[in-house]
């Protein structure tokens, strides 16, 4: 974490901070990126292969929580600048509820280097609070151990990752933002498995989380190829599959496809969701709530949690509660933070 902070601080010093931010962020923006989707996916896939340990949950967490049921929380389009109120609130809400994962649907920050420094500091604060709540120091081995878990593995502070998993959005990439985003989060294209028990034959069963790079409004040839090769399929026995995409598939409150994806890719994704036996597909981007059931897949498009786009308190987060048998309950989660008046 320290090295990444130094990189961002140096980057901030080297870049003239001359861009102006709008009082309200456009949901559409410009679907473009300083680094094209083919390059992003190529970099992400290589990073994911070499560092896939970063996309695994702590075994102690799984053993102590997921087998008996768990929850995860989802937010979208936070557009962080200098005000971290809503992002801090999301993290605190998750900690207070013992949510297992924190997922984000992209456009996490506007692309000034200083905003990414603020964001990384916010994640650092959340990591500290997370460790304070769930870990305790053992003097015998001078390590941090999971509270309430007998024989838990001892860890150093820097080895404990706060379980925050975002996708990349189009606003994360403007003004050459990919370098800043990827420096913090690594890959924009990855999966996570949550162990949730055993089947009748004694095989481990998982819930499967798939994170796509749709920030440019297209998957690109390489990402389609990797998906067709089964890179995101996983190798386990899966109970539920959850898919996360910044760009929405459907227009809110409409039976039409969104205009961002090429039509062939939209159909490709719908077929892929069926192949993955997807339970829920989460989308952001348009700053407008939408929910629908299509081909037995539940699609949720979330409103923006940004205090600029959604200045009043409101239900901007979603929590998914999963019991030990895999049954799912979805609830909207209220956010109370209001930005101080200038």
Locate each region found by the language model.
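Active-site glycine-centered loops adjacent to acidic/histidine catalytic or metal-binding residues
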Residues: 77, 106-107, 169-170, 246, ...
